[in-house]
Amino acid sequence: MKVDKEYLRLFPNLNVSYNLRENLIARGALYTSVGRPDYNQYAGGLTLPDTERVPDSASNRISVNNAGIKAWSANTSKVRLEYYFERVGQVSVAAFRRDFRNFFGSVVLPATPEFLSLYGLDPETYEKYSVATNYNLTTSVRMEGLEFDYKQALTFLPNWARGVQAFANATATRATGDGVANMAGWTPRLFNWGVSLTRPKYNLRVNWNYASRRRAGLVAVGRSIEPNTYDWRSKKLNIDVSGEYWLSKRVALFANLRNINDALDDIERAGPSTPAGAQLRQRNDYGSLWTFGIKGVF
């Protein structure tokens, strides 16, 4: 199989800014962008599931690459207001609207006899597995959102707390249009915040990362599966801690503790009439990853 693709395009953009005050700036932008699919899509072929595991449309399934998939394009308009604290940080708010063309969609289908025959797969082995693939949406998709960003060195604290910095950012988005039902993977709410302490000999950082519940993909209608049934990834809050201690100008000890609250990764399946207590399909417990080491600067 040979697939030819080219991305020779013009991407015009316009950026303007206006100083409302010495430390208050208004910005606006109009721009175009493109999103290329994973290059593995152009290889064609398929990935088979682990036949020793239970079939699962969210993870253990047949995946088919789409060599004919196109890159999506988008037109975006954005406004932003930025306020600067003198020498110690900034806070900003922004709003945007993005209209997509040929956006990526995903679908999960049953393994039909025709599909199994096309790829030469044994029906007795693979007919119980779902088939997942990607394609370009032919319908419209619009994404609208708000953004907030804050970062500041807390110089107003007492002398014993010198070196403390705080940050927070948030993104809230919504998708509208005929193609929204086939969208997968976007997260409506993202929140990140944290605090750090920096001293000449050491530094310490604590970060919180929150992602809201997000849709993973449409599930094909089948036995006991009603229309408009989707797989979902549950909301999750991760807490990470990291730090360094310098033994000398060139050598330091470091620690990186990921997911210290041991947040679970749940996969749910829900249709219009699925009770809340019956939505949990899979629970992954990856635990907390702790890394310690020594580093040098040469």
Tell where the protein language model's regions lie, with residue ranges.
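Residues on the lipid-exposed face of transmembrane beta-strands in outer-membrane beta-barrel proteins
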Residues: 14-18, 69, 79-83, 148-152, ...
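Gram-negative outer-membrane beta-barrel transporters
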Residues: 97-99, 104, 109-111, 116-218, ...
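Signature of Gram-negative outer-membrane beta-barrel scaffolds
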Residues: 1-23, 37, 54-58
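Transmembrane beta-strands of outer-membrane beta-barrel proteins
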Residues: 26-28, 91-93, 162-168, 193, ...
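Outer-membrane beta-barrel signature, preferentially recognizing the C-terminal barrel domain
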Residues: 5, 34-100, 121-153, 186-187, ...
